[in-house]
Amino acid sequence: MRIAAILVAGGSGSRFGSDIPKQFLPVGGKPLIRHGAERLSAKVDLLQPVGCADDIAPLLQGLDHLPIVDGGKERQDSVRAGLEALVPYAPDIVLIHDAARPYFPDHTIEDLIEALQIHDGAIPAVPVADTLKRAAGNIIDSTVPREGLYRAQTPQAFKFSVLLALHRDHPGGATDDAALLDQAGHSVALVPGAEDNIKVTYPADLARVERSMSISMIPRIGTGYDVHAFETGRKLILCGIEVPHHQGLAGHSDADVGIHALCDAIYGALAEGDIGRHFPPTEASWKDADSARFLRHAAERIAARGGFLANADLTLICEKPKITPHAPAMIARLAELLGVSIDKISVKATTSEKLGFTGREEGIAAQAAVIIMIPA
């Protein structure tokens, strides 16, 4: 069974009152859109973002997703564009998720998929708890019974072929996809939603999300250390870039000592072992491998745990080559691989004052520390 997700990132956020669309505003240390994208990418086979590629692409760096497609004037136009883009991949199930919803529980997708064994669609929903009033202006006209009323949330799940056919048969669709199925006589199930699954529409919503995340996320600290000896005849790769030097570093992979230390720090913070556990040096498949693959995997593990990288601090220890001239490029590359902004990454260098193997210019050592926020 192949599962795809459409991440709808259109809309200008006019009700939010900001020049920046709400889905691009920072919350919990990263753009709003990235929270949902990371949670989806850890659960589905295909992630299809819909919106302005120039705006979205930088915010999704490091995540595995399909080429971004342009959205439409209305939300349903954007969903249709995402569905058509998924046709060549023939998914069995498609999830539709609003980029303005940064959080949903891990069990939501499992609940939705289970419901699709019987129904053509399923949505998470929360029963309406407040008393509802119908009014004309500021004058109450009547009380609306709340029994049987629910607040719909996303992600919503549908059988791909059913939803695609309905969008093609009804251009413009309905106000939402569940309504489209309901109007066509298809059954749509409700699964339990979550009060924390907040859609950011107004400025106060952003504050609610920030408070919720600060309460539900806890910091995890990890450290990593690695060392490689110099070896003639190899390129010197440090923090994902090639550094001019007359020697490279010896190792089974490309021997990127900086990335290796950083990976160990991340795995340590997640209590998931070290780089050797995930990429054993005894396996031929990792011979001369680009260590960027290792760091991308570490970033994916953060996302799979529903967390985010708060910051990373890396120190390279060597007499030569000089690191400082290359530090900005190193920071940019690490930020790209981890899918974070450059202000979350620090790369600096020191020497051992001519002492030890680094002092004798026999190799390079690296020390890393990270703080990762994960759900409590």
Swiss-Prot record:
Site (Positions MEP for the nucleophilic attack): R146, K199
GO MF annotation list: 2-C-methyl-D-erythritol 2,4-cyclodiphosphate synthase activity; 2-C-methyl-D-erythritol 4-phosphate cytidylyltransferase activity; metal ion binding
Residue positions binding a divalent metal cation: D226, H228, H260
Cofactor: a divalent metal cation
Keyword Lyase belongs to the record: yes
EC number: 2.7.7.60, 4.6.1.12
Region (2-C-methyl-D-erythritol 2,4-cyclodiphosphate synthase): 220-376
Region called 2-C-methyl-D-erythritol 4-phosphate cytidylyltransferase, residue ranges: 1-220
UniProt protein name: Bifunctional enzyme IspD/IspF
Natural source organism: Granulibacter bethesdensis (strain ATCC BAA-1260 / CGDNIH1)
